[in-house]
Amino acid sequence: MSILNGPRLNFWGGIRTDVSLPNNSPTIPYDGNDDWPLFDLTTSTLAPGAEPYTDDQLNNMINAPTGNYYTAGGWNHYGQHVVDMQNALISSQGEPGSITTTGDLVGQAVYLLGSVDPVTGQGPVSGPMMVDLDPTASTTTQIFVGGLQIGGNDNIQLLIRSNTVCSSFDVAGRVLLPKKMDAPGSFHASGTFQLTFPLSSIVSWNQNSSGLRSIIQAPGATGIVLRFVMFEMCPTMTTEQLDADYAAGKYTPNPSIGRVIGTLAPAFADEPLNCQPGRQLVNQSTGNAGYADLDNTGYLSIDMVNVIPKETFRAVRDDITSPIGPNADYGTVTISAGSTTLTTLEPTSRYLFDYYVYGGIVDLPLTADQLQAVRTSALAITAPGKVAGTTLQATESTYRIYADQRNVYLEDYPNGLSITLQVRYLGGAVPSATEIGLQAAAPAVYDQPQYWDFLDFPDSLTVGSGELSVSFPVTLKPGSAAQAGFVALTCTANGLDSSAYFTNFRKYAQTDFGIPQGTTITWPLMYPNVLRFHYLAFPAMSRYIPLNQPDAIMGAKNPILARTSDAYKGTTLFMPVVRSMSPCQRALLRAYLTGEPWQPPQ
């Protein structure tokens, strides 16, 4: 199942995410006010109080040092949102019970790719793009991807071209110490991503590779799945370095850098595309999770990458390619099902000490009695020791809900959508009728109902005994066209928080910007309503086309019209890559560029 219980390629290395930060908050500290309103992030425009200031004044305010933590706008103002792996190399391959560090693909590099231009067929000219659906949230993000490559350009082993998107799961504790460092608090956390590429998206592959044959030609396989975890992430530059860089007028991007551990395996038709299937075990101290599944040959495979945290952040800030090292040592680790011990692992075991070499996956051969215990009892991973005030007790969420929809832009579903929830009890069908509760939750920042109360959905659902899934409709409430904002819809089984799954939604406003239909759109009508926010929040865009200069915008008319069109949606080339421009904003920009009379989209 997915990366568990079958052939796999494991890799590890470094990763960079070059995101821009000012759009993570609608406010900045300014003039004695810690929460001076700068943006309206629901509409991607400026806050009314910021409008009278010039662009230069606002940029200076965003880049102003705060004294002890980067700038008013955060730790990176000039990011291009590109994600790229650094020296991520295959370290082991094989099947459960025979994973080896000497396979034919060991040492080959793994790359995520950007999109080929969907119109010209050229490229890719950039990489994958990290995008927040809700920029104010800290629970999930997305990476838009255009493909995958194994091997360098002069020795390509596998080339995939496929536009897809993955979302982060299990954004929870992964590094215990230090308690604080010169970085956002997320340096403690990890994020798990899963991508699925259909077999039809394979452009070329080395058919002499036994490692690739085992995956691509696996019986019943429909695609290739990639699961990767990034953790130990922090900005490249410290506060002192970034402030000095800005003071010198360099405005250098300051990407977040860290570690990546990943696995490639065959994908099958009955599996989720972008989240891990299987039985979920949650570390009760850190909140992070692992996943387990039985195969048909008596093996229990457990993805333990995030089950045991790392004790201490790496010693050298910018060293992201040296050996990751072992996780925290809690003593002998016991894996059990109910009262039945399945195995014990010593801290010196390769599964613990060199876990990252093996994708963090443990494969356990089981006896008949152990198999029966696994099928009927909750799994647990425990150890006797304490590290940094934490204990190791990872217990199974007996009920688990998951789905393919994690981040949804409602503009893509004008007539609403149906969400299918997968519901499991100890990895199988529910043994009795199970109630699923649905609850919409306000985001932390935009918590007034006008910003999140716009969805119609049932309050509860029932999954019948012996069933595995249930579907429900999500539509927009009547009269909600003018609303803009974000909402998380959380589903729980039998009221158990441990079973919960959430989907984030973003809604753009339907508006004419107060501009009469038929008006010829001029720069003063377009710029404050569309491009000004993007010029200030994402200045890296202006290194290609200065967004605040009318002549430059008109000079780039054709590429802008192309890149804002529906043909580029779902690619890493869509403009803007951060997907913060509403359909009405794109229409206003197009009207300005073409000279066509203003006609707001309906």
Role assignments for model-derived ranges:
Residues 1-602:
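Aromatic- and Gly/Pro-enriched helix-to-coil junctions and flexible linker segments
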